[in-house]
Amino acid sequence: MLDMITAGIIRNGSNYLQHHLRRNDYWAEGEQAVLGEWIGDGARAVGLEGSVTDAPFESLRCNRHPATGEELTALGAKKSVSFIDVQLSAPKDVSVLATVGGDERVRAAFAESVKVVLAEMERFAAVRERRGEAKHSESFRLTGNFAGALFLHDASRDLDPQLHAHAVLANATWDAGRRGWFALQPAEMLRASPYLRQVLYRELASRLRSLGYEPYGLNSKGFSVRGVEHLRERFSKRSRAVEKLAAEFTVEKGRQPTKREVEILVRESRPDKLTAVSTPEVRARQRAELSVGEAKQLDALVSKARAQLPRE
């Protein structure tokens, strides 16, 4: 199973908004762009709320204040990291319900759960301590804010259902102690990822229960949804491919890959985004992987959940 919370470094990102974030992992001419929204106290501090637009995103990429155009952090053009892309993924059963099952309420529940997790994650935003005795240390100090943009995608590049979020964080955080913007240090946020995963799973399972589904087996790796679990392997082609690469690595190196090495395997083996494939075509391909009986069973499960009164 792939890690449900990962982070990647974006060093330039000049095309990242248009070519990656605004597009799903497939794309067709005329396809509606994926809409994003601003997140974080840092975003609000520079006047960013609501829908993501191009100009302020570009300002953050270039280390500029979106309203004034002034340089944010002192490193300016020398700063090699533009963004930190934090990715949060839903358990496979949830992705199947939201996409193949067509229950938009599940997609909304995932989005709401992600926002709760990101609010928790923001508490761990930090800067490197560079004052006094700590001037030359590698210690961090929490700032509790970041400026980011949130985008939701719903498929892997193998076209498996894979509901996931990109929280793209600008490499800047406001340090109240020094009254200025400094480079964002993600180490504490990543160190908190086991806790944050549990927050995501608990929030999402609770919301699914209120929608009429039966999540069960909550643990550190996720949870299952009754009536969907038998379809999980069918739509896990990407996970199987990564597991195969990890097994080959183990045979070659005589040891299992580290988490960082798995992330590299994932990145280097990732296929290009598919072009000339529309959302209806993707849904049709996914539905075609189900037998007639499986499709009827999934539709009945979704209809039953929709018919139930919301649960507190």
Predicted regions and their residues:
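Intrinsically disordered, flexible peripheral segments
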Residues: 1-312
